[in-house]
Amino acid sequence: MKIRKQFLLLFISTSHLFVYAQNTEPSMFTKEANEQVVKSLPFENKQDFEDATRGFIATIDEPSIIDETGKEVYGLTVWDFLRQEAPASANPSLWRQGQLNRIHGLFEVLPGKIYQIRGFDLANMTFIRSDNGWIVIDVLLSKETALAGYNLLKKHVENLPVKAVIYTHPHVDHFAGIDAILENAPNKPETIEIIGPKGFFED
């Protein structure tokens, strides 16, 4: 419950920032600073958008990821306001980064070997095909978002046994979705090795 409250607060804060950006007239200093950002960076170069969409396989059809009771856990349309141009009160570089981050779904990173779930949560979930099954790196913030991504992999790639799960660090959005893997992998949970960095439980 604490995790979901933190997640909800993040969305509320983001929404408030957007409303503030839309309804607040920026100072001349802010306008000039943001105009300078436009002049100093190659915004006409769209290579990063090509990179962000390369290898796209599929995403879910639903506008949000829900839990067992039907409550929304993660809204995929909450970032749709980023489709428009950055308002004068927003840093255009950060706005563009947000546009890249809102791209979601299952992606093939290395053909036949590495796949990634993006935009379903605060972090990315990566699947590496080993000789005898999947190695999963980071399992997102919630069971629901991790399961949505895991189901995409099983549907569009392959439902292999999960041999190991790796937590890269102890931020909650990198480990809290573990039940989605343990409860839905074709092999028993006790056969899945979980690996974390030294001091994981101390941070």
Placement of each model-derived feature along the sequence:
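Generic structural signal for hydrophobic residues
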Residues: 8-9, 149
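Active-site metal-binding motif and surrounding structural segment of the metallo-beta-lactamase
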Residues: 132-133, 143-196
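Bacterial N-terminal signal peptides
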Residues: 9-16
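Bacterial N-terminal signal peptides that target proteins for export
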Residues: 1-8
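N-terminal pre-domain segments of enzymes
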Residues: 22-99, 103
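Conserved beta-strand hairpin/beta-sheet module of binuclear metal-dependent hydrolase folds
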Residues: 99-160
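Metallo-beta-lactamase
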Residues: 108-109, 195, 199-203
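Sec/Tat signal peptide C-region and signal peptidase I cleavage site
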Residues: 17-21
